[in-house]
Amino acid sequence: MRRLTSAELDAYDVLPRALATRVRIQRMPFLTPGSNGMTIGRVVFLRNDGIHDGSRKITAHELVHVRQYYELGLLRFLARYLSGYARALWKHRRHRAAYYAIPFEQQAYAEADEWLARKALASPQ
């Protein structure tokens, strides 16, 4: 288990730096099929964790979840996440469609996309 590097702390602005310094990253090659990352509280599990330069969209996405956990607390976040998934699964009848319909996932994908766009604009051409 590792902490975010200084490059990652500088790059990932999707959560407050004070919270980012408390994040732990754990490589977990055996995540569920189709999943590259998962977050529980301030621990981020990544299928691959070989790049530590602050350039990975999956890390930005998972760090949004760290912030969501922090803002709501563990139990409220999990209750809302799972109820969002259950409602979406009832509606869509397929796991993948239900996953993408979870409000917390939509927010994390949107913020990671915005983060990547800001990063692209800031980098010299």
Residue ranges of predicted features:
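Metalloprotease/metallohydrolase-associated module, dominated by Zn2+-dependent proteases
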Residues: 1-36, 53, 73-125
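Generic hydrophobic/packing signal
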Residues: 46, 64, 112-114
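Active-site-flanking alpha-helical
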Residues: 64-72
